[in-house]
């Protein structure tokens, strides 16, 4: 069983595809679920109801649509947290209440630190024990080929404080070009959202890219981390060379 994590539909201001189109694209790619994480600031209570209802209507025996919201937390440095699960979202009277209920332990969903490579791998102290996961591989910011070296370092450091922490791989998809061959491969089949969330929270999956994969709870030693660091540097060098050989066309 496979699925895609961290997708945005046109419920978000920067999403280009409808939920129906996202599902069609996922099914065409032989995926069994998608975890949608819309920007929370785009929602009021009424829009949240419509969103949850549509996710439910698109879920069937062969495909699960898991709703979520992406929250922007401002402080010393802005971080984004993905809050995932229908039960969590339904129990909030307004979208702004979702984060508080999630992190207080009132709900059974997932809270995942999104794309840490975007914000210098910073995490507020008060989140270290309260989140369930870290997006250690974000295809939009880290490439589809390799996970982020420093995100994995952050994960392994925080897991010493939070033994239930799980690593996730997400697309951060906003349009068709965002389908970057990065998926979650579950160890057990799931028929319902609650069952899928239980397995995700427990880390019963691996993260697979087109050429490399990583367990949801990486505990890498020196050799693997060195290889990843070298691989990231080679990838960066290849991107620079590609840009020099074929620089982007100048706009008229």
Q: Model segments located where?
A:
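Hydrophobic beta-strand scaffold residues
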Residues: 65, 109-111, 167
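Non-catalytic positions within long, well-ordered alpha-helices that form the structural scaffold/packing
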Residues: 27-30, 104, 127
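An N-terminally biased module of ancient metal coordination in phosphate/nucleic-acid-related enzymes
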Residues: 1-75, 177, 248-251
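Binuclear metal-dependent hydrolase catalytic cores centered on His/Asp/Glu-rich metal-binding motifs
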Residues: 77-110
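Aromatic-lined carbohydrate-recognition surfaces of secreted/lumenal glycan-active proteins
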Residues: 110-120
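Charged catalytic cores and adjacent phosphate/nucleic-acid-binding surfaces used
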Residues: 5, 9-15, 19-20, 24, ...
């Amino acid at each position: 069983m496979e699925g895609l994590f961290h997708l945005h539909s046109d419920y978000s201001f920067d999403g280009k595809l409808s939920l129906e189109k996202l599902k069609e694209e996922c099914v065409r790619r032989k995926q069994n679920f998608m975890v949608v994480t819309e920007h929370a600031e785009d929602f009021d209570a009424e829009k949240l109801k419509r969103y949850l209802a549509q996710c439910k209507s698109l879920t069937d025996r062969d495909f699960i649509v898991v709703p979520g919201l992406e929250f922007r937390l401002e402080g010393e440095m802005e971080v984004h947290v993905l809050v995932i699960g229908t039960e969590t979202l339904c129990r909030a009277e307004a979208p702004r209440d979702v984060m508080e209920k999630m992190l207080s332990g009132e709900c059974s969903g997932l809270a995942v630190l999104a794309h840490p490579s975007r914000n210098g791998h910073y995490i507020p102290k008060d989140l270290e024990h309260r989140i369930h996961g870290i997006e250690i591989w974000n295809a939009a910011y880290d490439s589809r080929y390799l996970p982020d070296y420093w995100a994995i370092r952050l994960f392994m450091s925080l897991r010493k404080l939070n033994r239930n922490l799980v690593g996730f791989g997400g697309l951060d998809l906003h349009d068709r070009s965002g389908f970057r061959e990065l998926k979650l491969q579950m160890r057990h089949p799931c028929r319902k959202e609650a069952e899928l969330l239980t397995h995700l929270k427990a880390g019963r999956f691996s993260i697979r890219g087109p050429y490399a994969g990583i367990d949801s709870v990486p505990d890498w030693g020196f050799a693997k981390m060195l290889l990843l660091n070298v691989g990231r540097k080679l990838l960066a060098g290849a991107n620079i060379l590609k840009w020099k050989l074929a620089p982007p066309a100048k706009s008229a």
